[in-house]
Structure formats: C-alpha cells, structure tokens
Regions:
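ATP/NTP-dependent adenylation/nucleotidyl-transfer catalytic domains that generate, transfer
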Residues: 1-144
Length: 144
C-alpha cells in the first residue's frame, strides 16, 4: 500500500491443478502473471528471459521442510505430469490417455490428485441469509 503496488503471485497451472499450494494463501494474489502456465512452461520462460540455470534447476520446493521437494510429495515429476494435465484440459479421458502410451500409473497419479483437490479451486459456499448476500450469485450494484 505504501508504494501503491499490488503483490504478484508466483503460482502456476500445474500447482493449482495438482492442489500443491496453500489454500487462500499463495493461491490468492491480486495479480498472477504465471497462473496460466504449466510449471515446465515457467522453466522455459525463465530460460528465455536469461534467468541463471542455478535458479531454474533448483528442485521446486515450498521450503517448509528441509530437503523436501514438490515432486517427492506429489509422487510425479512436473515433466511427466504437465503433458497429462494438458491433455486432460483438452478433454481427453483418463482411458484415452492410458491407451495413448502415457504411463498408466502417471495418469492415475495425476487424475487422483486433480480429483481429490478440486475443492481447493472452488470459491467457498456462502450461507445466503438475505437477498443481498455476497456469494456466487452476487451482482454488483450499478454505478450511475
């Protein structure tokens, strides 16, 4: 506020889809320029922009516990998860992805995480106690 600026988010599409973020913390910045990029695309962008390899190649981690990395906790690498997420978002089914040659265990891992963390990508339900409750059906008053 002192600088008249807004904080930027650093979350990416892979983390959001896999549910690997803190709910209502790193998923709720006012601006998130990387939010529609998969993790592997963020790495590609960083290389394109000249970010040093020592930063890009550092294993992704929430840095909450020493020597614990994202991919260890997820059970799959972003390099394997991102193509699966991409094709699921394009409308392919789990069975189609499995029959396409992708690892069945990888597809199952991604699908389980995607399904189990869907609730994290929804707005909270508001108890509608009045006709002016601010929830999913809220309409902004018209400015005259």
């Amino acid at each position: 506020a002192k600088l008249g600026a807004l904080p930027l988010g650093t979350g990416n599409k892979s983390e959001r889809l896999l549910g690997y973020y803190t709910w209502h913390a790193d998923d709720s910045p006012p601006i998130n320029p990387l939010g529609d990029l998969f993790k592997t695309q963020v790495w590609d962008l960083a290389r394109h922009l000249g970010v040093p390899d020592v930063i890009i190649d550092k294993p992704a981690s929430a840095d909450l516990i020493r020597d614990v990395h994202d991919e260890d906790e997820l059970g799959i690498s972003y390099h394997r998860a991102d193509p699966i997420l991409h094709w699921l978002l394009q409308g392919y089914t789990v069975d189609e992805l499995k029959s396409s040659g992708l690892s069945q265990s990888d597809v199952d891992c991604v699908w389980r995480r995607l399904s189990a963390t869907h609730w994290k990508r929804e707005l909270p339900t508001v108890a509608m106690l009045s006709s002016t409750a601010i929830g999913e059906f809220y309409l902004r008053p018209v400015d005259y």
